[in-house]
């Protein structure tokens, strides 16, 4: 349904990383939709549903960091929850060629090199030990 009001178009939380990216493209930012997806993922109790939430590949964007980050999110959530790692996360386009440290964390490089979960580190994305933390997380 086409609507002129963007907030109406996103009344529900995204239930896939593809939906995160598609919604984010429409409003110009992905972070809030990723947080909503994580809340939805963490409250879902059925492992099959969780696996389906990670299975659908988000289209590649013009932002290689975002493409790699979404793959790291999917792989990390799959590993943490004993789910199969989606094949799409292993594509070369889902890996960075140069290390990336989020802005404002330059002074923490040494710590981030050690703490970054494997799914992020192997894509050369260096983040804290629990990059997908959400206060309401159940898993």
Question: Which residues does each PLM region occupy?
Answer:
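Charge-dense, extended regions
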Residues: 81-139
């Amino acid at each position: 349904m086409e609507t002129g009001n963007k907030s109406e178009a996103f009344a529900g939380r995204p239930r896939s990383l593809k939906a995160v990216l598609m919604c984010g493209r429409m409003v110009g930012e992905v972070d809030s939709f990723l947080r909503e997806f994580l809340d939805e993922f963490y409250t879902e109790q059925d492992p099959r549903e969780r696996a389906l939430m990670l299975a659908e590949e988000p289209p590649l964007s013009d932002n290689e960091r975002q493409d790699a980050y979404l793959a790291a999110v999917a792989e990390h959530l799959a590993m943490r929850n004993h789910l199969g790692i989606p094949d799409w996360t292993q594509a070369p386009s889902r890996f960075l060629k140069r290390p990336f440290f989020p802005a404002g964390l330059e002074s923490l490089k040494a710590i981030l090199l050690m703490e970054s979960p494997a799914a992020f580190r192997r894509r050369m994305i260096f983040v804290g030990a629990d990059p997908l933390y959400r206060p309401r997380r159940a898993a």
